[in-house]
Structure formats: C-alpha cells, structure tokens
Regions:
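Conserved N-terminal phosphate-binding loop of PLP-dependent enzymes in the Aspartate aminotransferase
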Residues: 1-290
Length: 290
C-alpha cells in the first residue's frame, strides 16, 4: 500500500490516477488536467520534453548511476563546470545530492563544520552554533531542514531545538538579531525574495542586501536556499545574481524535474575551510545518489 505525502490516510480523497503527462498537461483515463503546481515546482520545461527525454535515453545506454566515492565521470564533471560557468561570484564548489532537503542539510553541515574547522586551527576563536532563519520558512522535511523551517502544520510533532532563531523579514528585526546573537551566530539561511511553502510570501531585496552587510561585518555565513526560487522563478536566473551568498542550494528545476537531483554550492572561503592536511577537516557526507 502506498503511504501518500501530507495526507491523513484515513480521510484522504482518492488521488487522480495519471496515465500520461505531456507539456503542461496530466492525463487520467477520462480527463486532461493542467498541472498548475508543476509537480511541486520542478517541471519547468514540461513533461516529455524531447531534448530531455533523448538525453536521459542516451545516458542510460551508457550508465545510469556511478557513485562519486573514489570515482568520477564525464557527466558530473560537465555539470559541475556548467554550473561554475553561470553561477555568480566565486560559487565554484559543487556538492551533489539527491533532493533539496538533503542539499539543505549539506549546506548547514558545511556552515557548522566550517566554524569547527576554524576553531581547530585557531583555538582562540569561539565556537558558533546558532542558526538564524526566517519566520514562515520552509526548507524541507529532513530533520535539520525542519529545525530551520517554521511551519507547525508540517512539523508540529517534532520538538524544536534551541539552536535556531526565527525572525520576520524586516530589517529592524534582522539588525536586532545580529546585535543580540552575533557572537553565537554561525549562519543565516533564507529562501531569498520568495518564501514558497510558507505561503508564497514575498519580501524586498533590501532585506537581503542588509543581511549580506551584517554577515560580512560579523563573520556569519549567508545561505540561500534557491531550491524553489532558482532558474528564473524570481525574474533573474538566481537571486544570488543580485546578492551573493556564501552557500547556494539548488534543486527541483536543476534537472527539469526529470530525476531527483540537487546541489550545494560553496564559495572559495567555505571550501578553503575544509581544504587541509587534517583528515578531520573533510566534509563527511556522501549520499548514494549524488
């Protein structure tokens, strides 16, 4: 039996049974429906796009999946180079995973361990573990992603830990949070400009610009979760083109929705925080599918 997402299985209505999908349409036995939610915002080129279908068929004839543990291959190298070519600034270091939620987990692990590695090398530095996030945020359903999210409808059954502070998208609240917590703050994670599952809430670019200034002033890492907003959803290709984060998370439209895939992209500063002769400073994360 299938256990469906976000449903009370006892009372849920029978789902539409899809037998075919093409373009913007989903087909049942007797209906042609417009997929206005784009399979949770990932099918940006529509279903059965001939170029994407052909690419998958061509790759499958060679191999579908090879792990990156001790191995590499042309497709992942080409994808990484392509991302490096059109992402802004020095966002050049791509860590691949299988979903947006996992990519958020990787981003938070990067940020927290970045500080740990620095403290190893510089004992006079203070450990920083507090994470700043936004009210009404949604970053996924895995555990750390739930912690930085702020939606009781999704995550009411799980206790919040004390390591996250949520603020509204208002500059005075942002400045107050940095004034209060700057010596404890590790990172600030946001869905830039548009909060998706939290209610399609938009806010002004001035908030992000001020966040960048404060992060620079106090040595806090800025993380943009563009799983939903990336690839043109806000007008620009990425909000990161307007305000540059230290870590960028992409998913959903990354593959046009044809396979589950995501990437966490770090800048030079973050990557250098792991590049060391000390084996303990390696990023110890490795999804099967990446």
């Amino acid at each position: 039996m299938i256990w469906y997402p976000y449903e009370q299985m006892k009372t849920m209505k029978a789902p539409y049974k899809i037998i075919k999908a093409k373009g913007v349409h989903l087909y049942t036995e007797d209906q042609k429906l417009i997929d206005s939610v784009s399979s949770w915002w990932c099918m940006i080129h529509g279903y059965q796009h001939p170029e994407l279908t052909a690419a998958i068929q061509e790759q499958a004839a060679n191999f579908c999946h090879v792990m990156l543990g001790g191995l590499t291959h042309d497709p992942v190298e080409k994808l990484s180079a392509k991302l490096e070519g059109f992402l802004p600034g020095d966002l050049n270091y791509c860590f691949f995973s299988d979903s947006g939620s996992v990519a958020v987990e990787v981003a938070l692990k990067m940020a927290l361990q970045y500080n740990t590695n620095q403290c190893d090398d510089h004992p006079e530095m203070k450990k920083r573990t507090l994470i700043l996030a936004l009210e009404h945020a949604y970053h996924g359903d895995t555990f750390k992603a739930m912690e930085v999210g702020d939606d009781e409808d999704y995550h009411f059954a799980f206790d919040k830990k004390e390591g996250v502070v949520h603020i509204p998208t208002e500059i005075p609240a942002l400045e107050e949070a940095f004034a209060l917590y700057h010596d404890k703050l590790n990172c600030f994670i946001v869905e830039p400009l548009l909060q998706g599952a939290g209610g399609m809430r938009m806010y002004d670019i001035s908030f992000l610009k001020r966040a960048r200034e404060l992060c620079d002033e106090y040595g806090v890492l800025l993380i943009f979760d563009e799983v939903a907003t990336g690839f043109g959803r806000t007008g620009n290709r990425f909000v990161a083109d307007l305000v540059l984060p230290d870590i960028l998370v992409l998913g959903k439209a990354l593959t046009g929705g044809y396979i589950g895939h995501a990437v966490t992209v770090a800048n030079e500063k973050v990557f250098r925080g792991f590049y060391s002769d000390n084996e303990r400073h390696a990023l110890m994360h490795g999804p099967t599918f990446m």
